[in-house]
A protein has these predicted regions:
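Conserved active-site/ligand-binding neighborhood in enzyme cores
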Residues: 1-319
């Protein structure tokens, strides 16, 4: 499989996060409009329990990966860490701050790939060997809008509603890691030329979700030499037998149908709610594979509509 690093450079605010499942939906609609419905159906039919011709991660800030979800600190580990602080209050403040960190530097994962635990993470942070903090590349603000009467096409006086927009700083980059066995480099670029021009996510018709992109060949992750677990880099919906146990965070996804179906289709614009496992979640599999999860069928009244639940795994060793 070809490996690409897709570098997204936002040029407007985004209302929709750069999640693997949403990105896959945009790729499918781009393929439908550029190559036709038969080509899209041919692509989707290649997915099965043993084959995934396209594996996508979420979009992460440059040089960062998702913070792993690990076993909580034991009482003994907590006491040991607390001794490094002058007061219990200082320790409590630091722990509160660390629990809000959503990303970890790739260099920190390289150091800890063979001995990953919260205790080791926090110890190296306290010693100054790594720095655990969220990258400062974006800000999320409420943007207020006028409500509109759909019958009269006029603004309703005094009625406002807010939406959250994420604004990215100058030079901000989000990296999506791709494993591709279907498209060649030229056709993959055609897909993202289309998406970058039409926009990504909610309110793209009014300028949200605009971006430029680069596509670089190859990427290497810091993977454990003797792994006993994997960390998902994607929003992931597991299938039976993927793993025995794990540590994870969940999100309920209300997927929305895109393309010309978004303006009206039997069954409405929304898919059925799905429970997804967030990037950074860790699992102990019986065997290590190149991907986990599958396309999820029967998520809408329209036959053939699927949802992307495939995980790009990073092999690690949990201690």
């Amino acid at each position: 499989m070809a490996r690409y690093r897709l570098i997204i450079k936002p040029t407007s605010s985004f209302q929709t996060p750069l999640h693997s499942d949403t990105l896959f939906g945009h790729i499918c609609w781009a393929l439908r409009y550029l190559k036709g419905e038969d080509e899209l159906l041919k692509f989707l039919k290649l997915f099965n329990d043993d084959n995934s011709p396209l594996i996508l991660s979420d979009g992460f800030p440059k040089d960062y990966l998702p913070m792993p979800v690990l076993r909580p600190l034991s009482l003994d580990e907590e006491k040991e860490l607390q001794q490094k602080y002058r007061t219990k209050l200082e320790f409590a403040r630091e722990m509160k701050m660390l629990k809000k960190v959503s990303y970890i530097q790739v260099s920190a994962m390289e150091m800890l790939k063979n001995e990953l635990s919260y205790y080791n993470l926090y110890t190296k942070h306290l010693l100054g060997e790594i720095l655990l903090e969220n990258p400062n590349i974006s800000k999320t603000d409420e943007v207020w809008h006028n409500a509109k009467n759909r019958l009269t096409d006029r603004v309703i006086e005094g009625k406002l509603f807010a939406k959250e927009d994420t604004f990215y700083g100058k030079g901000a980059e989000l990296n999506v890691y791709v494993e591709d066995a279907y498209f060649n480099r030229k056709s993959f670029c055609e897909i993202f030329d289309f998406i970058s021009k039409s926009g990504y996510g909610a309110d793209k018709s009014v300028g949200r979700g605009a971006f430029e992109y680069d596509l670089l060949d190859g990427w290497d992750f810091p993977e454990a030499e003797n792994p006993n677990a994997f960390m998902t880099l994607s929003h992931y919906h597991p299938k039976e037998g993927d793993f025995k146990e794990g540590f994870y965070d969940t999100a309920t996804k209300f997927g929305k149908i895109g393309g010309h179906w978004a303006s009206g289709v039997d069954g409405g614009p929304y898919k059925m709610p799905l429970l997804m496992l967030n990037p950074g979640s860790l699992f102990f599999p019986d065997t290590h594979k190149t991907f986990y999860g599958s396309l999820i069928p029967n998520v809408h009244k329209q036959q053939g509509v699927v949802h992307y639940g495939i995980a790009l795994p990073l092999k690690v060793r949990i201690v």
